[in-house]
Amino acid sequence: PILDDCLENNIKIISNIGAANPIGAAKRIIEISKKQNTRKPKIGVVVGDDLLEYMSDTEILDSPTMEGLDFSNNNITAANVYLGAQPIADALAKDVDIVIVGRTVDSALALGPLIYEYGWKQKDLDLLGSGTICGHLLECGAQVTGAYFADPGFKDVPNLANVGFPIAEFSDDGSFVITKPEGTGGLVSKATITEQLLYETHDP
């Protein structure tokens, strides 16, 4: 069981599996740990993305982010904002085993642990930028190891059925290497990295 392996080897787990109910997800993990007879994990839960807990429908509709959208004839069933990396770093600083978040900017799942591990501050813009790029490369899993790049007959990628998920090996100077588990399918190359780097990158 992966959970037991991580707990026994002090491998932190950070995930946005909380979706609309991070607290519920944490409770479910506790249930799983009991069934698997692992030690009880210490879980940090990041909340705050659900605007309905803090704002009325009118306040949400009047906010600048809603400009140009007409929801006047509809009830708001959900309104969430993206949280950033700092809450993840703060949770890790409390010596938790697992951090569960809800709606979070994708790159924060990598940047948060890096902020915690290296003690980066807001002034460390180059390092934060490097961590953000690392998170962007990892955010879609196997896209960076060839799944996004693959175009059979034009851009062939070996053994996609057994594609390896990416691993980032990060250094304290902000440099990092993207690789994948040995013996897995897929491809890590300048081309696969470049395609994922440009993914969802728009004209600023």
What annotation goes with each model-predicted range?
Residues 1-60, 72-82, 87, 93, ...:
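Metallocofactor- and cofactor-centric catalytic cores in central/energy metabolism, strongly enriched
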Residues 21, 47-50, 100, 105-106, ...:
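Glycine-rich beta-alpha junction loops
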Residues 24-30, 34, 53-65, 109-116, ...:
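Short acidic, glycine/serine/threonine-rich loops at helix termini
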Residues 34-51, 111-152, 156-157:
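Catalytic or ion-translocation cores adjacent to nucleophile or general acid/base/metal-coordination motifs
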